[in-house]
Amino acid sequence: YEIPLRLVGSEMCIRDSSSPYILGSYLIGKEDRSILYTLAESSSMWEQRIAVVATLMLIRNGEFDDTIKLATQLLHTEYNLMQKAVGWMLREVGKRDQSLLIEYLDRYASSMPRTMLRYSIEKFPAEKRMHYLSLR
């Protein structure tokens, strides 16, 4: 999993496309996923983004806990690119378990950054999107 970490200074699309397959795949079946939380606590927005985007492979494997925990940990990030990444991963969780996403949004939508919220509800029907946007 050290390869995507070396890409921190490289193009965002390379990080986003490699993190799930390298770090995320590595973590499937592992109990110790502390590297995700270490990266999420980093002062580097790029390392934080690697942590969040790496969970895409876990999501595809039906494992949502780490994504939800990281989303909560990074809920108040001021970085627009992090808000987009967290919202994107929440949306991916919702594609597989909409009730979990709705439960999360019912709890946190009112305090989520607008960009994060918009990305997470992007695929919702208009009426449901408006409901969550009105909570802000």
Task: Name what the model sees in each region.
Residues 9-10, 41-43, 76-80, 107-115:
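Short coil turns that connect the paired helices of HEAT/ARM alpha-solenoid repeats
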Residues 92-136:
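Long hydrophobic alpha-helical segments typical of transmembrane helices together
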